[in-house]
């Protein structure tokens, strides 16, 4: 949908309809809802990562355009998803014209975060030989799901945020460059412990920092707060419990 169909509004408003969603077709089926929102140019590449750890690639112009209130098309009509797969995260690679090969830069990395607190870093160039039927992006244990994927230059600070409002912040390299927190490893491999979770807790998001970054945390019931990235304690090593980023209550959801 063209961005011109949307307008800037103040916080606290009702907003306007961004998409018509599909209602449940029976008692055993849930109604559809929006999970991902991003902007991209027509010739950019979209990297779709699924909950089972596979990756699919499409160009933006290959996705049919629809009005702001249109229902759109099922992603399964565009990607050869397997029966159990759903989209967990999307990365955008900016088109480089005749030099599209340059998008798969050797100094860029894909950082994965899974439901059980595992993280993995893999060189972006390992994904350039993609196939229509998808490729393995990360190996997952049974019962674990891929939750979020971000792009990094290998020298970022990472924040892992959990369902119960915890946040673990650590640097990719750590204090000792000879023994980094996150080493680049192969595509079809599992990862390492990123955060220690309490019983019943799980990862909901992963972000990396930029200069003067602010962290926006939004709860299920629409409460949000903005905090400077530096207010989160930097852990010397990955795998810690982190600190509270939001007190989760009945009010927040």
Question: Where are the predicted features?
Answer:
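Short, structured "edge-of-domain" segments at secondary-structure transitions
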Residues: 1-253
């Amino acid at each position: 949908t063209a961005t011109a169909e949307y307008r800037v509004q103040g916080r606290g408003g009702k907003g306007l309809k961004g998409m018509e969603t599909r209602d449940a077709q029976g008692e055993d089926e849930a109604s559809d809802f929006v999970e991902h929102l991003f902007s991209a140019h027509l010739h950019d590449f979209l990297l779709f990562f699924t909950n089972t750890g596979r990756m699919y690639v499409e160009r933006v112009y290959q996705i049919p355009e629809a009005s702001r209130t249109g229902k759109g098309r099922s992603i399964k009509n565009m990607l050869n998803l397997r029966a159990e797969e759903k989209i967990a995260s999307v990365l955008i690679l900016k088109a480089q014209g005749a030099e599209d090969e340059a998008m798969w830069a050797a100094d860029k990395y894909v950082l994965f975060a899974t439901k059980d607190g595992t993280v993995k870093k893999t060189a972006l160039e390992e994904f350039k030989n993609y196939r229509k039927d998808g490729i393995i992006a990360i190996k997952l244990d049974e019962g674990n799901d891929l939750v979020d994927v971000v792009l990094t230059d290998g020298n970022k600070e990472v924040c892992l945020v959990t369902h119960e409002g915890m946040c673990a912040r650590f640097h990719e390299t750590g204090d000792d460059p000879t023994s980094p927190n996150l080493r680049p490893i192969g595509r079809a491999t599992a990862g390492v412990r990123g955060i220690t979770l309490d019983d019943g807790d799980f990862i909901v998001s992963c972000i990396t920092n930029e200069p003067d970054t602010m962290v926006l945390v939004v709860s299920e019931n629409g409460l949000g707060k903005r905090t400077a990235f530096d207010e989160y304690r930097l852990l010397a090593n990955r795998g810690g419990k982190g600190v509270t980023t939001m007190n989760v209550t009945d009010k927040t959801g």
